[in-house]
Amino acid sequence: MWLGVITLFPEMFRAVTDFGVTGRAVKNGLLELHTWNPRDFTHDRHSTVDDRPYGGGPGMLMMVQPLRDAIHAAKAAAGEEAKVIYLSPQGRKLDQQGVTELAESSRLILVCGRYEGIDERIIQTEVDEEWSVGDYVLSGGELPAMTLIDAVSRLVPGVLGKQASAEQDSFSDGLLDCPHYTRPESLDGLDVPAVLLSGNHEQIRLWRLQQSLGRTFLRRPELFENLALTDEQSTLLAQFVEAMDKNA
């Protein structure tokens, strides 16, 4: 997957290229990341990249000319098939379904705003989609962009090594993940569930699915609104709720 990022702080993206899953993906040639800094497209000696908003008010906006030129440079490098994404609180909220959709694109250009944002005409003429990572305020689009990159890259074939790792992540099937355990078998009086030590793969699968359903029921019940449970899932969830009521 090819990724271009428009940012005033390209150094921040070393967290993507140098570390963890995404760092290995870059090293192995599965992920290619390039940055364009609007400061490199300025024409004054101060490398000015902000400007005052029409109508007054607090704060500044990113200057149009350097930002637009940076986007054009990224588009020229990416090719016509690239999709331009602006990280914005006004965008569609990123969830696993959205991540899956974005992962179908082989080339993405991510525009990271700063200050109070960017000129609306840039969004109208240069941006294909707006995405948000949540209903809260951040200082810029870099952290949302890194969040999007990390989530999308996990779905690129070969990045995780085993596709099962991605398939078992929280939200991959619309549910929260089940609990996980490692050694020792007993920790401060808390034991690993016996079923996980049984070696019975079918029973382990059912336990994990039931725990995933139960955890979603307890913590994020609204997720069920978008799910059509199978007969097996419905039965397991009913059993979980019944057992919970008995132990209440």
From Swiss-Prot:
The lineage of its organism: Bacteria, Pseudomonadati, Pseudomonadota, Gammaproteobacteria, Alteromonadales. Its EC number is 2.1.1.228. It comes from the Bacteria. This is tRNA (guanine-N(1)-)-methyltransferase. Keywords: Cytoplasm, Methyltransferase, S-adenosyl-L-methionine, Transferase, tRNA processing. Belongs to the RNA methyltransferase TrmD family. GO terms for molecular function: tRNA (guanine(37)-N1)-methyltransferase activity. The keyword Methyltransferase applies. Pfam families: tRNA_m1G_MT (PF01746). Specifically methylates guanosine-37 in various tRNAs. Homodimer.
